[in-house]
């Protein structure tokens, strides 16, 4: 294969945004005990920390996207030296348990998110948080529930067989719904049990979530959108249709599909009209933190050492070229690296 184009703007950028005002409360990435919570501000700070953990390099900031993008048919890896091979283990289906960067790192990071959501949920139910604004506290709890459901959904998509393989009877990942020590090693649940828990968390969160658009935060419509995808993966088509239709029909005042003219320009913007939910990524913080540098840069079309790792496959380009008017032509361009360096023969 000799692909000629590279992604100009990664689809993963769809999860990039949030204004600085969203982080006015100091985000915390570690809330070890219920004693850390005594006010609504403490709870909000902990929730901010959960979103920050999810946007980190080893989750939505980088590694998580490799599992899907690199193992599918639309792109292929450029086999360059050094960190440029960050994507090749996924592309070659050669991710090993001993490879901490590619296996234990994303696993551990997602469970950090789950652990912090459990701490926050327990705190909201403990009575230790003193506030007169119960609605605000309930919404914080609802967002934590939704984030726990999303995190478990992400784990099951990466580390388990699809539900369709055997109707969910294969082993999935451990379900953790209580505040446990990070050294605990719970047993794995089945895929079906995991989907039941995901749906329970997401569904239970809906009643407490706002239907207003909240930049950088989950709201009712975002969770309904996630639920529709969960049901689709579970082969529950009636409920997938019901959840998706709710969003499409009842959120028109907040969200609109991109026009053809808008499409090429939206990927570098925050809070666009079609986006139900976007994570905040810092453009200045190193990618090992909440910086979103990692995922976009593997698609970046530039001659930078150890980046520019993924390019469009020939099959994808052939399909794209069947329609010269396809709007996706506007976000692809010829690779900056000469002679297709690093491509497999």
Feature annotation, model-predicted:
Residues 3, 18-69, 244, 307-309, ...:
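Membrane-proximal, proline-rich intrinsically disordered regions
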Residues 47, 114-117, 195, 202, ...:
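Inward-facing hydrophobic residues that define packing positions of alpha-helical scaffold repeats
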Residues 133-135, 158-192, 196:
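Short coil/linker segments at helix-helix boundaries
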Residues 1-16:
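Sec-dependent bacterial lipoprotein signal peptides
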Residues 34, 61-82, 155, 160-169, ...:
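Short, surface-exposed recognition loops and adjoining beta-strand edges that mediate ligand/DNA contacts
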Residues 85-159, 189, 207-211:
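Conserved, well-structured interaction surfaces
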Residues 45, 241-345:
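Hydrophobic-face positions in mid-chain alpha helices that act as interaction patches
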């Amino acid at each position: 294969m000799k692909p000629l184009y590279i992604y100009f703007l990664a689809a993963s950028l769809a999860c990039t945004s949030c204004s600085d005002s969203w982080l006015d409360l100091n985000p915390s990435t570690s809330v070890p005990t219920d004693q850390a919570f005594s006010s609504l501000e403490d709870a909000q700070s902990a929730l901010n920390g959960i979103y920050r953990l999810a946007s980190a390099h080893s989750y939505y900031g980088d590694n998580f996207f490799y599992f899907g993008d690199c193992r599918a048919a639309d792109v292929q890896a450029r086999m360059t030296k050094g960190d440029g091979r960050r994507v090749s283990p996924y592309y070659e289906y050669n991710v090993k348990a001993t490879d901490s960067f590619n296996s234990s790192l994303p696993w551990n990071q997602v469970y950090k998110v789950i652990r912090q959501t459990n701490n926050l949920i327990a705190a909201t139910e403990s009575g230790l948080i003193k506030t007169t604004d119960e609605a605000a506290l309930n919404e914080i709890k609802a967002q934590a529930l939704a984030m726990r459901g999303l995190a478990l959904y992400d784990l099951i998509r990466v580390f388990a067989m699809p539900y369709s393989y055997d109707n969910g009877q294969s082993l999935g990942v451990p379900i953790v719904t209580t505040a446990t020590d990070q050294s605990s090693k719970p047993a794995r649940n089945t895929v079906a049990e995991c989907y039941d828990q995901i749906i329970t968390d997401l569904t239970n969160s809906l009643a407490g979530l706002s239907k207003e658009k909240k930049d950088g935060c989950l709201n009712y419509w975002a969770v309904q959108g996630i639920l529709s995808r969960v049901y689709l993966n579970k082969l529950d088509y009636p409920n997938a249709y019901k959840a998706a239709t709710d969003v499409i029909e009842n959120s028109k005042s907040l969200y609109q599909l991109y026009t053809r003219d808008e499409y090429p320009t939206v990927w570098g913007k925050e809070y666009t009209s079609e986006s139900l939910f976007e994570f905040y990524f810092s453009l200045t913080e190193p990618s090992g933190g909440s910086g979103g540098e990692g995922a976009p840069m593997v698609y970046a079309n530039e001659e930078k050492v150890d980046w520019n790792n993924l390019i469009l496959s020939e099959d994808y380009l052939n399909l794209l070229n069947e329609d010269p008017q396809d709007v996706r032509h506007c976000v692809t361009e010829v690779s900056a690296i000469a002679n297709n360096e690093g491509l497999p023969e």
